């Protein structure tokens, strides 16, 4: 969905294959393009499942493939499209961390986490799902401030003006997220806020889940290692700055991360040493402006070029080098020769 503006601006036609779980926005965009006068065939929508995907990956007229989704599917897209000679950018999963230093403004950090962890019910690739607290004092204060905020989240259909969090995308995904919460409890994490049994009046059969908050999460737990893609925030306690950076850098994903601190030296060291494609300082979600490139490192991205910015233009264009000579305009005596080994 993010790619078509750059692709079309660079002179390409574009085929959008949206998720079968969320097909409507793509069709609405196509209708708006039609009303705006975009010529037929420039922006196209194909709905379908893996059969449609495989057809695009192998079709000889498709020159480039962009994808955003889970890491296993991103790997499949990258390998299959590359095998068929396509240029590929495949954005995969994420486990985005927000590190909180002892000197941070905790109220700002809490506000940031409420939006970054629970906005869109945590169903976005840049959601913050891990809060890394430097020191037990920071963690204790953060939990104390977060708990009532998570408990009081206004959960209702997204069409309601007062809604702060809506439902999950499918009943199957709701069951999956609930299962992860159960795993976290079984593995020894402290479930501070349990939203598994949340019910919205009048929507008892809806795919609603309350916000969930864990403390004392460790790096070997499933809720830390896996991308849950739901309203579940894990608090991990570390003893110092270096331990926090090491924790983040050792994760298999390297999509985005951010630090909350008042210390410029800590911020500079963090931004230079952390192994992630998008890094923020005192911002909830480190999404860059569109004129910069968007994308992660490690198992969060497959392919050499990111989305948007200069990388986006490079991806949707091809380099052409032109060399010319105009003999009638060359001064007398000029010589052209190719260097040889003789």
Give each language-model segment a name.
Residues 1-111, 238, 303:
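Rossmann-like NAD(P) dinucleotide-binding subdomain of oxidoreductase/dehydrogenase enzymes
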Residues 13, 21, 50, 71-72, ...:
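Gly/Ser/Thr-rich beta-alpha loop segments that engage phosphate groups in nucleotides
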Residues 37, 64, 72-218, 247, ...:
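ALDH superfamily catalytic-core signature
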Residues 38, 62, 99, 154, ...:
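Conserved C-terminal structural/oligomerization subdomain of aldehyde/semialdehyde dehydrogenase
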Residues 55-56, 112, 247, 270:
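CheY-like receiver
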